[in-house]
Amino acid sequence: PVLEQADALIDQGHLYKTGGAASVARIEVNGRQLVLKRYNIKNTAHWLKRFWRPSRAWHSWIEGHRLEFLDIATPRPLAVLEQRVLGLRSRAYLVTEYVDGPDLTACFAPYVESGDAPEEQVDALVHVMQQLIRERISHGDFKGHNLFWHNGQWSLIDLDAMCQHATQLSFA
């Protein structure tokens, strides 16, 4: 039911981002908080670049499951949909669990002047970076707004540019 009414749910939800390449909203379905992301097609040129390869939603779905398998925190991917026109990819949607908590930027903002950030959060940030390095994973958009503090660890979001590199050379 969520994906059948995805656009309406995004319009009714708490919008985090709208327009451009993606629209993201926190939605509530049967009392459960979820995040619904619509990957938009901006124009014909964008469509020509995207229609022939798996969508960014599909890529995020795969990478979310990869992180889950590797025990790297990320909101659990729950559903993905690629819309097609005459068999060619068009818009795509991703549904994930909602992770409640502040992002890294908000967590560390009070400590910019002093540099005295909470040791637990700093250690957890080092830990997630070590996990990514160990697995040769580059996030593709690794910034403070894409890391959320949840249950004592940093949880990664916005995985559509994530890549696990086959060799150390390609990772470096």
Name the predicted role of every residue range.
Residues 142-149:
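Hydrophobic residue at the +6 position relative to the catalytic HRD Asp in the kinase catalytic loop
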Residues 2-105, 124-135, 139:
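Conserved ATP-binding subdomain of kinase catalytic cores across diverse folds
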Residues 118-122:
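Short alpha-helical scaffold element within the canonical Hanks-type protein kinase domain
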Residues 155-172:
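C-lobe/activation-segment region of protein kinase-like
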Residues 29, 149-150:
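Structural motif
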Residues 104-114:
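AlphaC helix of the protein kinase catalytic domain
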Residues 93-97, 153-159:
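A short beta-strand motif that forms the metal-chelation/ATP-contact edge
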Residues 42-46, 111-113, 158-160:
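Short glycine/proline- and charge-enriched loop/turn segments
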